Amino acid sequence: MKKKYRIAVLPGDGIGPEVMREAYKILNILKNHFSLPLETREFNIGGSAIDQEGTALPKKTLLGCENSDAILFGSVGGKKWDDLPINQRPERASLLPLRKHFNLFANLRPAKLYSELKYLSPLRSDIIKNGFDILCIRELTGGLYFGKPTGRLKKNNIEYAFDTEIYYNYEITRIAHLAFQLAQTRNFKICSIDKSNVLNSSVLWREIVKKVSKNYPDVHLSHLYIDNATMQIIKDPNQFDILLCSNLFGDIISDECAIITGSIGMLPSASLNEKKFGLYEPAGGSAPDIEGKNIANPIAQILSVSMLVRYGMNLKTIADKIDQSVISVLKKGYRTADISNNNNYLKTNEMGDVIANTLISGE
């Protein structure tokens, strides 16, 4: 590892700064207890940047990210900025440009049901008795969300709108290679999601995924149509390990997997480019309704640090220690408000302290 691993920290809006404070506790332990050569610099982003600097993504922030090895992101947005033109709102004017600027083509969304939190899942107990640990891998820069032409027109008093799904072979190839490489670090199993019985883009998707799979004979590949996949996830989520999806289908599937865990406050995510530069963030939003109340769940932000260590720094053992600290805390009965089934729960800072102390002690 090089002398310094530089992290651009972007707390953002809503609960972002609150949960980021707890992530800092973990980062400090990684520096001081595990002797990792981390260097953090904090930058403004989102609505707070609009208020202070007139733009959601200031040049200083972008430059700071360019001079870093990874981005640790909080959350952006809130009702305060909802009246702005849509392209100037924090979500559209900060996170999306960051993804585009750094060509973050791969979105990794883990969805894990912890045995201690099964009561949170909306699924029947017999369905989730064995739990599940799914990694959704979503292609993030191609497909329907970016295809041209797109528009809304009116002709002869008839209004219509259109979008275009376009996938280039190299876009599918690179996301498939990443999925197979990650499968080799997990359970050697991938299910690719498409709609190749209807869509030409999905026909190409399936053909290329099959072709790439020949380079990974130790990984079992299966395919499902998107409509069947959404049903199978509800019927038996434990049958899946890695789900490989296009942009649109991954958007749908990853949210479905998230909701059946019972709390999005537990779920981190990573967006990577071909050089493994990544943006790491909680899967949830800025939650302005609980901002400043010190009740937000910091676990997703802490696990985002774990993903940064795992995928950005390639330090699996230390990432596992962070993950295990979270599991240990849950086993001991510690809860935040969103995952508690009673009124006895920890505040945001208290949960951060418990996880940090557990990481140091290893208990």
Curated annotation (Swiss-Prot):
Reaction equations catalysed: (2R,3S)-3-isopropylmalate + NAD(+) = 4-methyl-2-oxopentanoate + CO2 + NADH
What keywords are assigned to this protein? Amino-acid biosynthesis, Branched-chain amino acid biosynthesis, Cytoplasm, Leucine biosynthesis, Magnesium, Manganese, Metal-binding, NAD, Oxidoreductase, Plasmid
- InterPro entries named among the record's database cross-references: IsoCit/isopropylmalate_DH_CS (IPR019818), IsoPropMal-DH-like_dom (IPR024084), Isopropylmalate_DH (IPR004429)
Where does this polypeptide localize?
Answer: Cytoplasm
What's the superkingdom here? Bacteria
**For this chain's UniProt record, which GO biological process terms are given?**
L-leucine biosynthetic process
Q: Name one Pfam family in it.
A: Iso_dh
Zinc listed as a keyword: no
Please provide, in alphabetical order, the Gene Ontology terms of the cellular component aspect for this entry.
cytosol
Q: Which Gene3D superfamilies match?
A: Isopropylmalate Dehydrogenase
Co-factor note (free text):
Binds 1 Mg(2+) or Mn(2+) ion per subunit.
What this protein needs as a cofactor is:
Mg(2+); Mn(2+)
Q: What class of enzyme is it?
A: oxidoreductase
Identify its protein family: Belongs to the isocitrate and isopropylmalate dehydrogenases family. LeuB type 1 subfamily.
Fetch the NCBIfam families from UniProt.
Answer: leuB
Subunit structure of this entry? Answer: Homodimer.
What does this gene product do? Catalyzes the oxidation of 3-carboxy-2-hydroxy-4-methylpentanoate (3-isopropylmalate) to 3-carboxy-4-methyl-2-oxopentanoate. The product decarboxylates to 4-methyl-2 oxopentanoate.
Q: What is this protein called?
A: 3-isopropylmalate dehydrogenase
Name of the gene encoding the protein in the UniProt record = leuB
